[in-house]
């Protein structure tokens, strides 16, 4: 196996920390960005490593959605001021799906693009060749699926997952038919747009939608995008299931934060995914006034939620929380907890579970009657529902 590397040095344009008492400005160290083309058993994958990995912390590993690359998907989030604090504590490894990076050449005729399972199996090679100990995944759409498959197959490599717009299910036959039609060049941008944005967003935020449409048309290799789209739409069901004591269920072993906008085209899929995961390790965050691009539309809320999540993993205990106020959430209660107390939020404070809302009220389930959040599982009787752990649901 070989890796090609290009070093690019850049410094922050302004100081991010200031010691006001001494009048001394503490500048962040210059970050070194290294681009690698890493050869794996399933082909070459392009990665961009930002910062130097720390031995006692995981590396944030990102994976983008179809029609995007790591820059168009995550730059708006990582360039946001509140994310700089996280960038100081963690190195970041951006993974571009094969052929999706800027300036990628078209695949030759007859090229067999990796399946979604094979894309996930490229990641252990990336982790090993870069000398990373463990990672914390941040993925959206197709990237969220790939990271989840990676975590299911290699749980020892993944400490946590932040999954935006995750769909754990295989595509239906209608979507399969749409994939066939997407072979026509003119249909591909529309198909990708319908995946990224809801109908409401297309009408309410036409400038943003048009920006990404132009990116798909002019800034990324459409032939390569088509391969990635077909691979995603041919994905298998992840077959995850909510664990039951005494059984060996297929589920994530690490903490997971599921994120979705309340008008996202993926909202139903994310709720279904939440219903299949371990409620003691999973938090569902629904963002109001947000569609399929929370990292672009609501970067402040997403950055704040990210901080809470990494605090729950034991990192950044002194991180500043300035954008959102926390409030109690009734959905965090767990009648089956060993200590009998209410379940805690994913922080090191030991305080009662809080949602990331600004009104300070208890978080309500997303139902019309405003009752407490229910676990999204099918139950055979009322008693089993009452005795099962409740998933934490948060609105912001």
UniProtKB/Swiss-Prot annotation:
Annotated GO biological processes are:
pronephros development; signal transduction
Q: Which GO terms describe its cellular component?
A: cytoplasm
Output compositional bias ranges, type Low complexity: 327-340
Q: Which domain of life is it from?
A: Eukaryota
Q: Where are the sequence repeats?
A: 340-349, 350-359, 360-369, 370-379
Compositionally biased, Polar residues: which spans?
Answer: 378-390
Indicate whether Repeat appears among the record's keywords.
Answer: yes
Q: Which Gene3D superfamilies does the entry link to?
A: alpha/beta hydrolase (3.40.50.1820)
Pfam families in alphabetical order:
Ndr (PF03096)
Annotated stretches, region: Disordered: 326-396
InterPro entries xref list: AB_hydrolase_fold, NDRG
Query: Region 4 X 10 AA tandem repeats of G-[NS]-R-S-R-[AS]-H-T-[DGN]-[DET]: start and end of each range?
Result: 340-379
Basic and acidic residues composition bias: residue spans:
346-377
Q: Respond yes or no to whether keyword Ribosomal protein is given for this record.
A: no
Alphabetical keyword list: Developmental protein, Repeat
The record's similarity note reads: Belongs to the NDRG family.
The protein's job, in short, is:
May be involved in pronephros development, after specification of the pronephros.
Q: What is this protein called?
A: Protein NDRG1-A
Which species does this protein come from?
Xenopus laevis
Q: What is the lineage of its organism?
A: Eukaryota, Metazoa, Chordata, Craniata, Vertebrata
